[in-house]
Protein backbone atom coordinates (compact mmCIF):
# COMPACT_ATOMS: atom_id res chain seq x y z
CA UNK A 1 0.00 0.00 0.00
CA UNK A 2 2.84 2.42 0.81
CA UNK A 3 4.27 1.70 -2.63
CA UNK A 4 0.94 2.56 -4.25
CA UNK A 5 0.65 5.86 -2.38
CA UNK A 6 4.22 6.75 -3.30
CA UNK A 7 3.58 6.05 -6.96
CA UNK A 8 0.37 8.11 -6.91
CA UNK A 9 2.26 11.02 -5.37
CA UNK A 10 4.75 10.76 -8.19
CA UNK A 11 1.90 10.57 -10.68
CA UNK A 12 0.40 13.80 -9.33
CA UNK A 13 3.74 15.55 -9.17
CA UNK A 14 4.38 15.02 -12.88
CA UNK A 15 2.91 16.90 -15.80
CA UNK A 16 -0.72 17.65 -14.97
CA UNK A 17 -2.86 16.47 -12.07
CA UNK A 18 -6.48 15.56 -11.45
CA UNK A 19 -8.67 18.65 -11.28
CA UNK A 20 -11.31 18.22 -8.63
CA UNK A 21 -14.98 18.70 -9.49
CA UNK A 22 -18.45 18.38 -8.08
CA UNK A 23 -21.40 17.33 -10.26
CA UNK A 24 -24.79 19.01 -9.95
CA UNK A 25 -28.10 17.93 -11.52
CA UNK A 26 -30.89 20.52 -11.49
CA UNK A 27 -34.22 19.12 -12.67
CA UNK A 28 -32.58 17.00 -15.38
CA UNK A 29 -34.90 14.99 -17.62
CA UNK A 30 -34.30 12.72 -20.59
CA UNK A 31 -36.72 11.78 -23.36
CA UNK A 32 -35.98 10.18 -26.71
CA UNK A 33 -39.29 11.09 -28.35
CA UNK A 34 -40.19 14.34 -26.58
CA UNK A 35 -43.12 12.71 -24.79
CA UNK A 36 -42.02 9.74 -22.71
CA UNK A 37 -39.27 10.37 -20.18
CA UNK A 38 -36.73 7.75 -19.13
CA UNK A 39 -35.18 10.04 -16.50
CA UNK A 40 -37.51 12.29 -14.50
CA UNK A 41 -36.72 15.50 -12.59
CA UNK A 42 -33.27 14.33 -11.47
CA UNK A 43 -31.85 16.54 -8.70
CA UNK A 44 -28.54 15.57 -7.11
CA UNK A 45 -25.34 17.13 -5.77
CA UNK A 46 -22.23 14.94 -6.00
CA UNK A 47 -19.43 16.38 -3.90
CA UNK A 48 -15.86 16.89 -5.04
CA UNK A 49 -13.86 13.63 -4.54
CA UNK A 50 -16.97 11.65 -3.60
CA UNK A 51 -17.58 8.06 -4.75
CA UNK A 52 -21.27 7.85 -5.69
CA UNK A 53 -22.95 4.70 -6.97
CA UNK A 54 -26.12 4.66 -9.10
CA UNK A 55 -27.92 1.36 -8.50
CA UNK A 56 -31.23 -0.05 -9.64
CA UNK A 57 -32.83 -2.71 -11.84
CA UNK A 58 -32.30 -2.85 -15.60
CA UNK A 59 -34.05 0.00 -17.39
CA UNK A 60 -34.18 2.33 -14.37
CA UNK A 61 -32.20 5.09 -16.14
CA UNK A 62 -28.89 4.79 -14.31
CA UNK A 63 -26.68 4.30 -17.39
CA UNK A 64 -28.59 6.98 -19.28
CA UNK A 65 -27.88 9.39 -16.43
CA UNK A 66 -24.19 8.50 -16.49
CA UNK A 67 -24.10 9.02 -20.25
CA UNK A 68 -25.62 12.48 -19.79
CA UNK A 69 -22.71 13.36 -17.50
CA UNK A 70 -20.33 12.12 -20.19
CA UNK A 71 -22.11 14.07 -22.91
CA UNK A 72 -22.99 10.91 -24.83
CA UNK A 73 -26.71 11.62 -24.32
CA UNK A 74 -28.36 15.01 -24.77
CA UNK A 75 -30.23 16.52 -21.82
CA UNK A 76 -33.89 17.09 -22.67
CA UNK A 77 -34.62 19.45 -19.77
CA UNK A 78 -32.78 20.85 -16.76
CA UNK A 79 -29.17 21.80 -16.10
CA UNK A 80 -26.01 19.79 -15.48
CA UNK A 81 -22.89 21.31 -13.94
CA UNK A 82 -19.40 19.88 -13.57
CA UNK A 83 -17.81 22.11 -10.98
CA UNK A 84 -19.21 25.59 -11.64
CA UNK A 85 -19.43 25.00 -15.39
CA UNK A 86 -22.76 24.40 -17.14
CA UNK A 87 -22.06 21.51 -19.52
CA UNK A 88 -25.41 20.91 -21.26
CA UNK A 89 -23.96 21.91 -24.62
CA UNK A 90 -20.30 21.06 -23.99
CA UNK A 91 -18.83 18.30 -26.18
CA UNK A 92 -17.76 15.07 -24.44
CA UNK A 93 -14.09 15.69 -25.24
CA UNK A 94 -14.24 19.06 -23.49
CA UNK A 95 -15.91 17.89 -20.25
CA UNK A 96 -12.73 16.71 -18.52
CA UNK A 97 -14.13 13.25 -17.81
CA UNK A 98 -12.77 9.73 -18.21
CA UNK A 99 -15.08 6.77 -18.77
CA UNK A 100 -14.66 3.03 -18.21
CA UNK A 101 -17.16 0.77 -19.96
CA UNK A 102 -18.52 -2.71 -19.26
CA UNK A 103 -16.85 -4.16 -22.37
CA UNK A 104 -13.47 -2.42 -21.77
CA UNK A 105 -13.58 -0.81 -25.27
CA UNK A 106 -9.94 -1.64 -26.01
CA UNK A 107 -8.54 -1.61 -29.55
CA UNK A 108 -7.71 -5.29 -30.26
CA UNK A 109 -4.93 -4.54 -32.78
CA UNK A 110 -3.07 -2.24 -30.39
CA UNK A 111 -0.79 -3.14 -27.50
CA UNK A 112 -1.71 -2.16 -23.96
CA UNK A 113 0.76 0.72 -24.19
CA UNK A 114 -0.78 2.03 -27.40
CA UNK A 115 -4.30 1.65 -26.03
CA UNK A 116 -3.37 3.77 -23.03
CA UNK A 117 -1.58 6.33 -25.19
CA UNK A 118 -4.23 6.67 -27.89
CA UNK A 119 -6.30 9.48 -26.34
CA UNK A 120 -3.22 11.44 -25.33
CA UNK A 121 -1.82 11.24 -28.87
CA UNK A 122 -5.07 12.63 -30.25
CA UNK A 123 -4.65 15.56 -27.87
CA UNK A 124 -1.07 15.98 -29.16
CA UNK A 125 0.49 15.45 -25.74
CA UNK A 126 4.32 15.24 -26.07
CA UNK A 127 5.71 11.70 -26.23
CA UNK A 128 7.90 12.03 -23.14
CA UNK A 129 4.88 13.03 -21.05
CA UNK A 130 2.78 10.19 -22.52
CA UNK A 131 5.48 7.68 -21.67
CA UNK A 132 5.77 9.00 -18.12
CA UNK A 133 2.01 8.91 -17.52
CA UNK A 134 1.70 5.36 -18.88
CA UNK A 135 4.64 4.18 -16.79
CA UNK A 136 3.24 5.66 -13.58
CA UNK A 137 -0.31 4.41 -14.20
CA UNK A 138 0.99 0.93 -15.05
CA UNK A 139 2.89 0.82 -11.74
CA UNK A 140 -0.18 1.84 -9.76
CA UNK A 141 -2.33 -0.81 -11.46
CA UNK A 142 0.38 -3.49 -11.56
CA UNK A 143 0.22 -3.95 -15.34
CA UNK A 144 3.81 -3.00 -16.26
CA UNK A 145 4.54 -6.53 -17.48
CA UNK A 146 1.59 -6.39 -19.90
CA UNK A 147 2.36 -3.09 -21.67
CA UNK A 148 3.54 -4.75 -24.89
CA UNK A 149 0.80 -7.39 -25.03
CA UNK A 150 -2.43 -7.27 -27.03
CA UNK A 151 -5.81 -7.32 -25.23
CA UNK A 152 -6.49 -10.88 -26.48
CA UNK A 153 -3.51 -12.09 -24.43
CA UNK A 154 -4.92 -10.71 -21.17
CA UNK A 155 -7.45 -12.01 -18.67
CA UNK A 156 -10.69 -10.14 -17.97
CA UNK A 157 -9.25 -8.57 -14.84
CA UNK A 158 -6.10 -7.47 -16.65
CA UNK A 159 -8.14 -5.92 -19.47
CA UNK A 160 -10.21 -4.07 -16.89
CA UNK A 161 -7.03 -2.69 -15.32
CA UNK A 162 -5.89 -1.50 -18.74
CA UNK A 163 -9.23 0.29 -19.21
CA UNK A 164 -8.75 1.94 -15.81
CA UNK A 165 -5.21 2.91 -16.74
CA UNK A 166 -6.35 4.49 -19.98
CA UNK A 167 -8.80 6.57 -17.95
CA UNK A 168 -6.13 7.50 -15.38
CA UNK A 169 -3.66 8.96 -17.86
CA UNK A 170 -6.25 11.49 -19.01
CA UNK A 171 -5.90 13.45 -15.72
CA UNK A 172 -9.69 13.84 -15.75
CA UNK A 173 -11.62 15.58 -12.98
CA UNK A 174 -14.40 12.97 -13.04
CA UNK A 175 -14.26 9.19 -13.48
CA UNK A 176 -17.40 7.53 -14.88
CA UNK A 177 -17.66 3.74 -14.59
CA UNK A 178 -20.55 1.98 -16.34
CA UNK A 179 -20.97 -1.56 -14.93
CA UNK A 180 -17.23 -2.24 -15.35
CA UNK A 181 -17.29 -5.59 -13.50
CA UNK A 182 -20.32 -7.21 -15.16
CA UNK A 183 -18.26 -9.39 -17.50
CA UNK A 184 -16.03 -10.82 -14.75
CA UNK A 185 -16.53 -13.99 -12.73
CA UNK A 186 -17.55 -13.74 -9.07
CA UNK A 187 -14.05 -14.16 -7.61
CA UNK A 188 -12.55 -11.55 -9.91
CA UNK A 189 -15.45 -9.15 -9.28
CA UNK A 190 -14.74 -9.31 -5.56
CA UNK A 191 -11.06 -8.57 -6.17
CA UNK A 192 -11.72 -5.71 -8.60
CA UNK A 193 -14.24 -4.11 -6.23
CA UNK A 194 -11.47 -3.58 -3.72
CA UNK A 195 -9.05 -2.50 -6.47
CA UNK A 196 -11.40 0.24 -7.71
CA UNK A 197 -12.20 1.40 -4.16
CA UNK A 198 -8.48 1.59 -3.38
CA UNK A 199 -7.86 3.45 -6.64
CA UNK A 200 -10.45 6.06 -5.66
CA UNK A 201 -8.85 6.43 -2.24
CA UNK A 202 -5.39 7.11 -3.62
CA UNK A 203 -6.43 9.26 -6.60
CA UNK A 204 -8.90 11.33 -4.59
CA UNK A 205 -11.00 12.37 -7.58
CA UNK A 206 -14.76 12.20 -8.18
CA UNK A 207 -16.07 8.74 -9.10
CA UNK A 208 -19.57 7.97 -10.41
CA UNK A 209 -20.22 4.25 -10.70
CA UNK A 210 -23.23 2.47 -12.25
CA UNK A 211 -24.26 -1.06 -11.29
CA UNK A 212 -27.32 -3.28 -10.92
CA UNK A 213 -25.52 -5.22 -8.17
CA UNK A 214 -26.48 -4.00 -4.70
CA UNK A 215 -23.40 -5.72 -3.20
CA UNK A 216 -21.13 -3.53 -5.34
CA UNK A 217 -23.12 -0.47 -4.34
CA UNK A 218 -23.02 -1.23 -0.62
CA UNK A 219 -19.30 -2.05 -0.50
CA UNK A 220 -17.95 0.72 -2.75
CA UNK A 221 -19.93 3.93 -2.50
CA UNK A 222 -19.67 6.86 -0.09
CA UNK A 223 -23.30 7.40 -1.05
CA UNK A 224 -25.75 5.35 -3.07
CA UNK A 225 -28.44 6.67 -5.42
CA UNK A 226 -31.21 4.08 -5.73
CA UNK A 227 -33.22 4.48 -8.96
CA UNK A 228 -36.44 2.99 -10.30
CA UNK A 229 -38.31 3.85 -13.52
CA UNK A 230 -36.17 6.94 -14.06
CA UNK A 231 -36.80 8.41 -10.60
CA UNK A 232 -34.47 8.75 -7.63
CA UNK A 233 -35.91 6.62 -4.83
CA UNK A 234 -33.36 7.42 -2.11
CA UNK A 235 -29.89 8.92 -1.72
CA UNK A 236 -27.97 7.90 1.37
CA UNK A 237 -24.84 6.38 2.86
CA UNK A 238 -24.82 2.56 2.55
CA UNK A 239 -25.54 1.80 6.22
CA UNK A 240 -28.27 4.43 6.46
CA UNK A 241 -29.85 3.04 3.31
CA UNK A 242 -29.84 -0.43 4.84
CA UNK A 243 -31.09 0.62 8.28
CA UNK A 244 -33.64 3.23 7.19
CA UNK A 245 -35.02 2.51 3.70
CA UNK A 246 -37.63 5.13 2.85
CA UNK A 247 -39.82 2.83 0.75
CA UNK A 248 -40.81 -0.78 0.19
CA UNK A 249 -38.83 -0.83 -3.05
CA UNK A 250 -35.57 0.30 -1.45
CA UNK A 251 -36.07 -2.07 1.48
CA UNK A 252 -36.51 -5.02 -0.88
CA UNK A 253 -33.75 -4.03 -3.29
CA UNK A 254 -31.00 -3.48 -0.72
CA UNK A 255 -30.00 -6.55 1.26
CA UNK A 256 -29.46 -10.23 0.50
CA UNK A 257 -31.50 -12.26 1.20
CA UNK A 258 -34.02 -9.50 0.75
CA UNK A 259 -36.23 -8.20 3.53
CA UNK A 260 -39.29 -10.29 4.45
CA UNK A 261 -42.62 -8.49 4.01
CA UNK A 262 -45.69 -9.42 6.07
CA UNK A 263 -49.22 -8.00 5.98
CA UNK A 264 -50.37 -6.90 9.44
CA UNK A 265 -53.18 -4.95 11.08
CA UNK A 266 -52.07 -2.15 13.38
CA UNK A 267 -53.97 -2.17 16.68
CA UNK A 268 -53.97 0.12 19.70
CA UNK A 269 -55.12 -0.53 23.25
CA UNK A 270 -54.66 2.39 25.61
CA UNK A 271 -51.23 3.79 24.79
CA UNK A 272 -49.87 0.47 23.50
CA UNK A 273 -49.56 -0.41 19.81
CA UNK A 274 -49.36 -3.94 18.44
CA UNK A 275 -49.33 -5.75 15.11
CA UNK A 276 -51.73 -8.57 14.31
CA UNK A 277 -49.93 -10.88 11.90
CA UNK A 278 -52.25 -13.79 11.14
CA UNK A 279 -53.23 -15.14 14.55
CA UNK A 280 -50.22 -13.60 16.33
CA UNK A 281 -50.38 -10.32 18.25
CA UNK A 282 -46.94 -8.75 18.61
CA UNK A 283 -46.41 -5.53 20.64
CA UNK A 284 -44.48 -2.59 19.18
CA UNK A 285 -41.83 -0.92 21.34
CA UNK A 286 -42.52 2.61 22.54
CA UNK A 287 -39.31 3.85 20.94
CA UNK A 288 -40.58 2.85 17.51
CA UNK A 289 -43.85 4.71 18.06
CA UNK A 290 -42.33 8.00 19.21
CA UNK A 291 -41.98 10.50 16.37
CA UNK A 292 -43.88 8.34 13.89
CA UNK A 293 -47.31 8.68 12.29
CA UNK A 294 -48.55 5.29 13.50
CA UNK A 295 -51.65 6.78 15.15
CA UNK A 296 -53.24 7.44 11.75
CA UNK A 297 -52.84 3.77 10.75
CA UNK A 298 -54.71 2.21 13.67
CA UNK A 299 -57.04 -0.60 12.50
CA UNK A 300 -55.53 -0.43 9.01
CA UNK A 301 -53.43 -2.97 7.14
CA UNK A 302 -49.75 -2.09 6.96
CA UNK A 303 -46.69 -3.96 5.69
CA UNK A 304 -44.09 -5.09 8.21
CA UNK A 305 -40.53 -5.56 6.98
CA UNK A 306 -38.18 -7.93 8.81
CA UNK A 307 -34.61 -8.52 7.69
CA UNK A 308 -33.56 -12.21 7.70
CA UNK A 309 -30.87 -11.58 10.33
CA UNK A 310 -33.50 -10.12 12.69
CA UNK A 311 -35.19 -13.52 13.08
CA UNK A 312 -33.32 -15.40 15.80
CA UNK A 313 -32.98 -19.02 16.86
CA UNK A 314 -30.91 -18.40 20.02
CA UNK A 315 -32.60 -19.51 23.26
CA UNK A 316 -31.46 -16.39 25.09
CA UNK A 317 -33.20 -14.11 22.57
CA UNK A 318 -36.37 -16.21 22.55
CA UNK A 319 -36.56 -15.99 26.36
CA UNK A 320 -36.15 -12.20 26.27
CA UNK A 321 -38.81 -11.75 23.53
CA UNK A 322 -41.37 -14.55 24.06
CA UNK A 323 -44.21 -12.43 22.65
CA UNK A 324 -42.65 -12.54 19.17
CA UNK A 325 -41.61 -16.21 19.32
CA UNK A 326 -43.16 -18.88 17.11
CA UNK A 327 -42.62 -22.40 15.80
CA UNK A 328 -41.51 -22.80 12.18
CA UNK A 329 -41.41 -25.91 10.00
CA UNK A 330 -38.24 -25.59 7.92
CA UNK A 331 -38.81 -26.68 4.31
CA UNK A 332 -35.54 -25.48 2.76
CA UNK A 333 -32.05 -24.79 4.09
CA UNK A 334 -29.27 -22.92 2.27
CA UNK A 335 -25.95 -23.58 4.00
CA UNK A 336 -23.56 -20.65 3.51
CA UNK A 337 -20.64 -21.76 5.69
CA UNK A 338 -20.73 -19.84 8.97
CA UNK A 339 -24.43 -19.09 8.52
CA UNK A 340 -27.48 -20.63 6.90
CA UNK A 341 -30.77 -19.43 5.44
CA UNK A 342 -33.88 -21.12 6.82
CA UNK A 343 -36.98 -21.01 4.57
CA UNK A 344 -40.47 -21.55 6.00
CA UNK A 345 -44.12 -20.47 5.95
CA UNK A 346 -45.17 -17.95 8.57
CA UNK A 347 -48.78 -16.79 8.87
CA UNK A 348 -49.36 -17.22 5.14
CA UNK A 349 -46.08 -15.60 4.04
CA UNK A 350 -42.84 -17.07 2.72
CA UNK A 351 -40.08 -16.06 5.11
CA UNK A 352 -36.29 -16.45 5.24
CA UNK A 353 -34.22 -16.32 8.44
CA UNK A 354 -30.43 -15.93 8.46
CA UNK A 355 -28.99 -17.75 11.46
CA UNK A 356 -25.73 -19.27 12.64
CA UNK A 357 -24.93 -22.68 11.17
CA UNK A 358 -23.50 -23.74 14.54
CA UNK A 359 -27.00 -24.71 15.65
CA UNK A 360 -27.82 -28.00 13.94
CA UNK A 361 -31.01 -27.69 11.88
CA UNK A 362 -32.24 -29.99 9.12
CA UNK A 363 -34.91 -29.75 6.48
CA UNK A 364 -38.23 -30.81 8.00
CA UNK A 365 -37.30 -29.75 11.54
CA UNK A 366 -39.66 -27.67 13.63
CA UNK A 367 -37.65 -24.91 15.31
CA UNK A 368 -38.42 -22.10 17.72
CA UNK A 369 -37.68 -18.63 16.31
CA UNK A 370 -38.28 -15.08 17.47
CA UNK A 371 -38.55 -11.75 15.64
CA UNK A 372 -36.57 -8.75 16.88
CA UNK A 373 -39.36 -6.18 16.68
CA UNK A 374 -36.95 -3.39 17.63
CA UNK A 375 -35.50 -3.82 14.13
CA UNK A 376 -38.86 -4.04 12.32
CA UNK A 377 -39.81 -1.61 9.54
CA UNK A 378 -43.42 -0.58 8.94
CA UNK A 379 -44.66 0.65 5.55
CA UNK A 380 -47.87 2.21 4.25
CA UNK A 381 -49.59 -0.52 2.23
CA UNK A 382 -51.00 1.92 -0.33
CA UNK A 383 -48.08 4.30 -0.93
CA UNK A 384 -45.34 1.82 0.09
CA UNK A 385 -43.60 4.67 1.95
CA UNK A 386 -41.89 3.92 5.29
CA UNK A 387 -43.87 4.89 8.40
CA UNK A 388 -41.22 3.98 10.97
CA UNK A 389 -38.02 1.97 11.45
Task: Enumerate the predicted regions with their spans.
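Glycine/charge-rich catalytic "coupling/switch" loops of P-loop NTPases
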Residues: 272-331, 350, 360-389
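ABC ATPase nucleotide-binding domains
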Residues: 92-249, 253
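Pre-Walker A (P-loop) beta-loop-beta motif of ABC nucleotide-binding domains
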Residues: 42-53
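The feature captures the beta-strand-to-loop junction immediately N-terminal to the Walker
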Residues: 55-57
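Conserved coupling/switch loops of ABC nucleotide-binding domains, chiefly the family-specific signature
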Residues: 76-79, 129, 229, 376
